[in-house]
Curated annotation (Swiss-Prot):
Gene3D superfamilies: YVTN repeat-like/Quinoprotein amine dehydrogenase. Phosphorylated at Ser-653 by PRKCI. Phosphorylation is enhanced during cell polarization induced by calcium. Phosphorylation may occur during the cell-cell contact-induced cell polarization and may contribute to the segregation of LLGL2 from the PRKCI/aPKC and PARD6B/Par-6 complex. Belongs to the WD repeat L(2)GL family. This is LLGL scribble cell polarity complex component 2. The gene is LLGL2. It comes from Homo sapiens. One of its GO terms (molecular function) is GTPase activator activity. Keywords: Cell cycle, Cell division, Cytoplasm, Exocytosis, Phosphoprotein, Repeat, WD repeat. It is found in: Cytoplasm. The keyword Electron transport does not apply. Pfam families: LLGL (PF08366), WD40 (PF00400). Changing residue 645 to A: Decrease of phosphorylation.
């Protein structure tokens, strides 16, 4: 062990590291992946969602969120919140029941599982005898009634889940108590519905699948009323006063039954097929809700004409002569209607319809004419179009923030002004200290701006680039439009749209300057757009410039997709970010890197063929540079083609086999088997947890120029530094490629007074070839004080000190395998760190982050945050390149999660744990978005929502996960990620979302953002 101990162990530094670094997984943003159940508590005003992976999530007022995970990881099929209690019961698809409760600890509520139970039948009984189909929590909160496939209703006592066998309501007992004319064995089968009498807790309703419905007296164990339908029963609703039943059936009909002692076997008052007379699909659930105005609301799921609309996912609302079938683009999991919470109230008075679909949550305002949707403060459908890239910008100036919100508010005119109606609990989270933006690029050519300041991710504004190009779909087309005479009266609702007009529209890179309001976005087909924020609508032509990256090459032929056709005339753009120039790369390959310098008015872009520089003030191309190696023929077959020849694949496979045999023979004497992998395992033994281990560095093998796409541009970086000599600094552009080559160009940018008259000039000053030829993923210049250069315009806005231009500058080059510091302008090696402690470890993401001390307000350090392909995150000091801490963050098998990770400027990060969810984590003790909230069962809210909304979101569950090598370690929490990433289907879905179809000649975009540029301390 002695050789693994790092010499010079400094207790003072160790204490300082504990003040700076701490790893926490804090909150999951977005929509739960694969939801399977919905529940709601009218008294607590809390919404519950269960998923197929065994997770349950509770949501209340913005900022109130809880998360739990069943150990079995089985699908949640039902969720029931106990009336007036901070408790809920879940039913899983393995027929197990689980009791959860919200308990106050340390001043905040936590969701905990208390008990679990599986209903057992007598020995030799068929599994269907105890297979639960319906769960009814009694209003006493002491009993659960469990309907089963056998037709029996079992009774279980809470909270211990003790089965009360003497209270079982068997199908035989019901049969014996029916009149002679109703005693047909065929009327039983499974229990489809259980309802408690709205006014009398001693009566329950039991509905059987064959059409029989009975009202059972719990005290007298007798049938009070029975109703027999000729159609198979799907569900049933009991009106608030208990005088009317409404049943729905498999043929698309519903019936109204009077509950009266005058007739023991009444005929239905009314039987109706809403979308008849042609055959219709089943109505699976129906609600009949009374109002003070006298006319009820009829709300039901399904029932659409089978032949023409059988594939639609609809919920219909009928009231006062108005009928609308809300049409969802994904399957409806469940719905609930928010009504008067007081059980003693005379009327239901519904005010909101809450629908959980497979891919989104939709809330409809039932109080406003036209029934408009309500804007969501949380549970955003991040994947309404597949996410293709992300970009984070910290500390947004107030002026820009307000302008973005103003532009977004104009897009929300179709939303209701109702306050968010699900407002249970109290958020204890303090207001965020700054304004942060998370920008997501999507497959349909849109960029969405999210408020990522706190624990609630809220959509602020959506930018679409589709108007710039000629596509098959008219951007002005209104998909929600509905003809007056059209039947059924369908209305599209929700934002989820899984289809893209043209995958070439997909956004691959985003770069926003928060000081100037300039935005650059780049796409799948080589398009680079530069946009400027405008508070007014404008009609303008977008200037088009072509950048031929192969202008000096002969004999190359592009075999991939074609470029997008741009509109030639003026285009009308709404207030917000408006494009004014389009740079089209030729060949139209995926843009792999992007950098914007708003002070110099320059934008740089790179593809698998080369890179270029464009002056967006003069609207002219400065230069292009082809980086193709003669062996890079595959780069011309399309950005998605990765197919090697069989001969080459076999040759490289045999080479790898020989290398692995040789290296394994050489490694054997170094220690026992498995010793090299020790660094990747969690420190299980207490004696090793606090011991700092020195990494075992293996030799870096030089790569052949034929091993990969050497010309693939991975990173671009602007810097004002010493490039030619030590006496004069100048603007410069740096580019790093997949083949380990760094190009440096000196730039001559005219002063402001002559900026429009003189052209920007560029001259190649240096070309550096790394010996090991590993891909370059990051470039950074440090000033004379070894501090990263500030962002463009940051000094001009007095938000950063001027860089030290007196001392010598240093160049940091981060490749996949090592970090190397060079002196400038001579470019002589000064320091290096090999990131090779673990076999196969490669750098995937790198960013500069500022870590503030939690004890001293005025103390902080700049470090590198590094993510590897093994899912580890390391913090490396600047400029000495000393490893500080290492945490296990993402599972190494989660390739897509690693590819989607983005760091922030203050030591936080985001990555996708499913196609619809971001996991948020923090490496800093100071910048920690810590969600806390409180729910009290005594605080029953009966007020109805007014106008306005203030979204905020916060879970109270401990979400910390991973191994901390330094600092104070927190216990891992039960995060949803653990359940999702244990499912290979989820991993494949995320990977397909990020990477796309890699087939040759296909339009599917290569969505995984490859490489990460260090942009003057910003985050990408």
């Amino acid at each position: 062990m002695r050789r693994f101990l790092r010499p010079g162990h400094d207790p003072v530094r160790e204490r300082l590291k504990r003040d700076l670094f701490q790893f926490n997984k804090t909150v999951e943003h977005g929509f739960p992946h694969q939801p399977s159940a919905l529940g709601y508590s009218p008294s607590l005003r809390i919404l519950a969602i269960g998923t197929r992976s065994g997770a349950i999530k509770l949501y209340g007022a913005p900022g109130v969120e809880f998360m739990g995970l069943h150990q079995e990881n089985n699908a949640v099929t039902q969720i029931h919140l106990l009336p007036g209690q901070c408790q809920l019961v879940t039913l899983l698809d393995d027929n197990s029941l689980h009791l959860w409760s919200l308990k106050v600890k340390g001043g905040a509520s936590e969701l905990q599982e208390d008990e679990s139970f599986t209903l057992r039948g007598p020995p030799g009984a068929a599994p269907s005898a105890t297979q639960i189909t319906v769960v009814l929590p009694h209003s006493s909160c002491e009993l659960l009634y469990l309907g089963t496939e056998s037709g029996n209703v079992f009774v279980v006592q809470l909270p211990a889940f003790r089965a009360l066998e003497d209270r079982t309501i068997s199908s035989d007992a019901v049969l014996q108590r029916l009149p002679e004319e109703a005693r047909h064995r065929r009327v039983f089968e499974m229990v489809e519905a259980l309802q408690e009498h709205p006014r009398d807790p001693n009566q329950i309703l039991i509905g059987y699948s064959r059409g029989l419905v009975v009202i059972w007296d719990l005290q007298g164990s007798r049938v009070l009323y029975h109703f027999l339908s000729s159609q198979q029963l799907e569900n049933i609703w009991w009106q608030r006063d208990g005088r009317l039943l409404v049943s729905c059936h498999s043929d698309g009909s519903y019936c109204q039954w009077p509950v009266s002692s005058e007739a023991q076997q009444p005929e239905p008052l009314r039987s109706l097929v809403p979308y008849g007379p042609f055959p219709c699909k089943a109505i699976t659930r129906i609600l009949w809700l009374t109002t003070r105005q006298g006319l009820p609301f009829t709300i039901f799921q399904g029932g659409m004409p089978r032949a023409s609309y059988g594939d639609r996912h609809c919920i219909s609302v009928i009231h006062d002569g108005q009928q609308t079938a809300f049409d969802f683009t994904s399957r409806v999991i469940g719905f609930t209607v928010l009504t008067e919470a007081d059980p003693a109230a005379t009327f239901d008075d519904p005010y909101a319809l809450v629908v959980l679909a497979e891919e989104e949550l939709v809330v409809i305002d039932l109080q406003t004419a036209g029934w408009p949707p309500v804007q969501l403060p949380y549970l955003a459908s991040l994947h309404c179009s597949a996410i293709t890239c992300s970009h984070h910008v910290s500390n947004i100036p107030l002026k820009l923030w307000e302008r973005i919100i103003a532009a977004g508010s104009r897009q929300n005119a179709h939303f209701s002004t109702m306050e968010w109606p699900i407002d249970g609990g109290t958020s204890l989270t303090p207001a965020p200290p700054q304004r942060d933006l998370l920008l997501t690029g999507h497959e349909d050519g849109t960029v969405r701006f999210w408020d990522a300041s706190g624990v609630c991710l809220r959509l602020l504004y959506k930018l679409s680039t589709v108007r710039v190009f000629l596509t098959d779909t008219d951007p002005n087309e209104n998909f929600s439009a509905q003809g007056e005479d059209e039947w059924p009266p369908l209305r599209k609702v929700g934002s989820f749209d899984p289809y893209s007009d043209d995958p070439r529209l997909g956004i691959q890179k985003i770069f926003l300057c928060k000081y100037s309001g300039y935005l650059a976005v780049a796409g799948t087909a080589g398009q680079v757009l530069v946009l400027e924020l405008n508070d007014e609508a404008a009609e303008q032509a977008v200037e088009q410039v072509e950048a031929d990256l192969l202008q000096d090459q002969e004999g190359y032929r592009w075999k991939g997709h074609e470029r997008l056709a741009a509109r030639s005339g003026p285009v009308r753009f709404e207030p917000g970010f408006q494009p004014f120039v389009l740079v089209q790369c030729q060949p139209p390959a995926v843009v792999t890197s992007l950098a914007l310098h708003s002070e110099w008015r320059l934008v740089a872009f790179g593809t698998s063929h080369g890179f270029g520089l464009f002056d967006h003030q003069q609207r002219r191309q400065v230069f292009v540079k082809c980086t193709l190696h003669p062996s890079d023929q595959l780069a011309l077959e399309g950005p998605l083609s990765r197919v090697k020849s069989l001969k080459k694949s076999l040759r490289q496979s045999f080479r790898r086999m020989r290398r692995s045999r040789v290296s394994s023979r050489k490694r054997h004497p170094a220690g026992p088997p498995g010793e090299a992998q020790e660094g990747s395992a969690k420190a299980e033994r207490p004696g090793l947890q606090n011991m700092e281990l020195a990494p075992v560095q293996r030799k870096i093998e030089a790569r052949s120029a034929e091993d990969s796409f050497t010309g693939f541009v991975r990173t671009l970086y602007f810097a004002d530094t010493y490039l030619k000599d030590s006496s004069r600094h100048c603007p410069s552009l740096w580019a790093g490629t997949n083949g380990g080559t760094i190009y440096a160009f000196s730039l001559r940018v005219p002063p402001a007074e002559r900026r429009m008259d003189e052209p920007v000039r560029a001259e190649q000053a240096k070309e550096i070839q790394l010996m090991h030829r590993a891909p370059v993923v990051g470039i950074l210049v440090l000033d004379g004080h070894s501090v990263p250069l500030p962002e463009p315009l940051e000094v001009a806005h007095d938000l950063s000190k001027s860089p030290d231009m007196q001392g010598s500058h240093q160049l940091l080059v981060v490749s996949e395998e090592q970090f190397k510091v060079f002196t400038l302008p001579k470019v002589s090696a000064k320091l290096k760190l090999k990131l090779t402690a673990l076999e196969g470890s490669r750098v995937r993401r790198v960013s500069v982050a500022h870590f503030g001390s939690r004890r001293a307000e005025d103390y902080g350090e700049h470090h590198l945050a590094v993510l590897t392909n093994l899912g580890d995150i390391q913090v490396v000091s600047l400029p000495l390149l000393k490893p500080q801490v290492r945490y296990s963050c993402i599972r190494r098998e989660d390739v897509s999660g690693i590819a989607s990770c983005v760091f922030t400027k203050y030591g936080q990060g985001f990555y996708l744990i499913s196609p619809s969810e971001f996991e948020r984590f923090s490496l800093s003790t100071k910048w920690l978005v810590e969600p806390r909230c409180l729910v009290d069962s005594a605080e029953t809210k009966n007020h109805r929502p007014g106008n306005g909304a203030g979204p905020k979101k916060a879970p109270s569950r401990a979400r910390n996960s991973g191994t901390q090598s330094d600092g104070e370690e927190k216990q891992p929490g039960l995060v949803m990620e653990r359940a999702l990433l244990s499912d290979e289907r989820v991993l494949k879905e995320i990977q397909s979302t990020l990477e796309g179809d890699r087939g040759s000649g296909n339009w599917r975009s290569h969505r995984a953002a490859v490489g990460c540029s260090l942009s003057n301390g910003g985050a990408e």
